[in-house]
A protein has these predicted regions:
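Conserved phosphate/anionic-ligand binding catalytic regions in large, soluble enzymes, centered on
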Residues: 309-321
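Terminal amphipathic helices with adjacent charged low-complexity linkers/tails
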Residues: 60-101, 204-242, 248
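Glycine-/acidic-rich phosphate or pyrophosphate-binding loops and their flanking alpha/beta elements
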Residues: 136-159, 293-307
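Redox- and metal-dependent alpha/beta enzyme cores, enriched for Fe-S-associated oxidoreductases
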Residues: 155-182, 197-204
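Conserved thiamine diphosphate
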Residues: 10-61, 85, 239-255
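Conformationally flexible catalytic loops at phosphate/diphosphate-handling active centers
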Residues: 55-150
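Peripheral docking tails and interdomain loops at the edges
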Residues: 212-303
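Short acidic, glycine/serine/threonine-rich loops at helix termini
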Residues: 6-13, 39-43, 66-73, 77, ...
Length: 321
């Protein structure tokens, strides 16, 4: 997932290209780190073959796509065990072939277009269940716990962040640190299947003790009441037991701006700053124009003791980009 040019060209990572694809009809599955790219890539391929809906399996540009990391790789025989070869054969038969031609891409007038457009609904209704089934098969194979929405943190959390992508690893690290060191009750809902968006599965993932939700979007939609994931969450929770929970909207990481544990702490602490609480905010920058940014209190070192960290400086042809 990479930045779409706006006031300037930027080739680095955010979710503006993904959100721009929302109306295409593609299902969207998100991975947060290199291991998940391996695991959920399998889920995406198998789900699209069975579900007959195209998939975008996305992960953050450069931050995840260019990361060198040790992972557990798949034995292709394990993948073969999960493949529905009857569905593969059906998939191949639907390919364009002069031996059995079909007509696609017709022009339709107002009398029929709307009805035909709605006819695809059963396929999209079925996709979450198909994805969930393949996630369960992957879980059985490799001992993971992939769900459409994964929860991480205190079982009785009072403040929960909803996010997707590589920032989730940073949030998890911050949760571990704050819950252990400061006795907080914080959590994270990690969005995996972004489209189709299953509201009931999101509700299942949120602890019943939740009093505050902060939704983090890695894009900016100028003029909107909120960014896409935030609006999805607000709509999903309406009419549920969380209908009166305060929901804040935050932007982060545009154009690969770094997001640190100290900034995530500021998101959690935002709700406790009664006099300066911001229902709409940014992190990672100092906004001296519209004053939406949250203040961070120094550096938060959440790395395990004994960690060696190195920073490599480079640009372009040396391989760092």
């Amino acid at each position: 997932a990479r930045c779409v040019a706006s006031h300037a060209l930027n080739i680095f990572g955010d979710h503006s290209d993904i959100y721009a694809c929302r109306q295409t009809g593609f299902a969207m599955l998100c991975s947060s780190n290199v291991q998940e790219v391996m695991d959920l890539g399998t889920v995406a391929h198998l789900s699209t073959i069975e579900g007959r809906v195209p998939f975008i399996h996305f992960f953050d540009g450069f931050r995840t796509s260019h990361e060198i990391q040790k992972i557990e790789t798949w034995d292709m025989e394990d993948v073969r065990d999960m493949v529905d070869f009857e569905k593969v054969e059906e998939f191949r038969k639907r390919a364009l072939n002069p031996e059995h031609p079909v007509l696609r891409g017709t022009a339709q007038n107002p009398d029929i277009f709307f009805q035909a457009r709605e006819a695809c609904n059963p396929y999209y209704d079925a996709i979450p269940g198909i994805v969930e089934d393949y996630m369960n098969k992957v879980n059985e194979k490799i001992g993971t716990n992939y769900k459409l929405f994964n929860y991480y943190g205190a079982p009785d959390a009072t403040h929960v962040i909803v996010a997707m992508g590589s920032v989730c690893d940073t949030i998890e690290e911050t949760i571990d640190y704050l819950n252990e060191k400061e006795g907080t009750k914080l959590g994270l809902v990690k969005v995996r299947l972004y489209r189709p968006f299953r509201a009931d599965k999101l509700v299942e993932a949120i602890p019943s003790t939740c009093e505050q939700i902060s939704v983090l979007d890695r894009t900016k939609e100028p003029g909107s009441e909120g960014e896409p994931l935030y609006l999805d969450v607000v709509a999903a929770l309406k009419g549920t037991q969380f209908h009166d929970v305060a929901i804040a909207s935050g932007r982060y990481g545009l154009g690969s701006k770094d997001t640190t544990p100290a900034q995530i702490k500021a998101v959690y602490w935002n709700a406790s700053w009664k006099d300066t609480y911001k229902p709409r905010f940014t992190i990672g920058i100092e906004d001296d124009v519209t004053n939406l940014s949250l203040e961070t209190e120094g550096k938060l070192d959440s790395a395990p003791a004994g960690t060696t960290a190195c920073k490599f400086w480079g640009l372009g042809a040396d391989g760092t980009v």
